[in-house]
């Protein structure tokens, strides 16, 4: 990635996971948002595929859990210390990426996208994270194991491997589910 970044001559760099499909016009929309709102990093959490029962059952809960751990509204506030990004789709100012230490600063990060957002915010720059159907993931989760591994990598890491915090978050999710109007 560092070798590729050295060849970048554009003011913005688009970082995409290989399984992400973007709707027509979304890159220009991200660019416009970045320019109009003076954002150094714009990130979209891609819509998961929802092709099988386990995905339809667990992926909405994972997205909800991710938003509990990384509240988008707080992450998007310049004064907030909370930083978050979804690595599937990130448009970042090339200079900001370099200022943040580029990819070498992420080599030991367990959650590289959120770490990148944190580096950029610490540099005094603004970030944005949103949900969108304009970025769609084609990465399938055929069973419980790959979903559990993803949750363990993201959520459990953010909770500092605390079973107590995991149980609290789980109880909050259950309470919100039970309190939801159906």
Model regions and ranges:
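Catalytic donor/gating beta->alpha subdomain of glycosyltransferases that bind UDP-sugars
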Residues: 34, 41-66, 98, 103-166
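Glycine-rich, basic loop-to-helix element that forms the pyrophosphate-binding segment
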Residues: 1-8, 29
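Short acidic donor-binding/metal-coordinating loop in glycosyltransferase active sites
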Residues: 4, 10, 18-20, 112
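Short glycine- and hydrophobic/aromatic-rich loop-to-beta-strand nucleating segment
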Residues: 83-92, 96, 114
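Acidic donor-binding/catalytic loop of UDP-sugar-dependent glycosyltransferases
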Residues: 18-33
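Alpha-helical bilayer-embedded segments of polytopic membrane proteins, i.e.
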Residues: 158-182
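Short aromatic/hydrophobic "clamp" motif used to bind/position activated sugar donors
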Residues: 13
């Amino acid at each position: 990635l560092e070798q590729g970044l050295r060849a970048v001559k554009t003011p913005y760099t688009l970082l995409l996971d290989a399984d992400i499909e973007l709707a027509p016009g979304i890159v220009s929309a991200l660019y416009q948002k970045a320019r109009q709102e003076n954002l150094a990093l714009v990130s979209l959490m891609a819509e998961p595929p929802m092709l099988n029962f386990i995905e339809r059952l667990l992926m909405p809960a994972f997205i909800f859990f991710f938003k509990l751990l990384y509240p988008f509204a707080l992450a998007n506030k310049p004064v907030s210390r909370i930083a978050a990004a979804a690595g599937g789709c990130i448009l970042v100012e090339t200079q900001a990426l370099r200022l943040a230490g580029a990819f070498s600063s992420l080599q030991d990060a367990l959650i590289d996208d959120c770490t990148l957002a944190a580096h950029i915010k610490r540099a005094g720059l603004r970030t944005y994270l949103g949900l969108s159907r304009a970025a769609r993931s084609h990465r399938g989760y055929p069973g419980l194991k790959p979903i559990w591994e993803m949750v363990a990598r993201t959520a459990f890491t953010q909770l500092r491997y605390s079973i107590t915090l995991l149980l609290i978050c789980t109880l909050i999710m259950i309470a919100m589910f039970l309190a939801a109007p159906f």
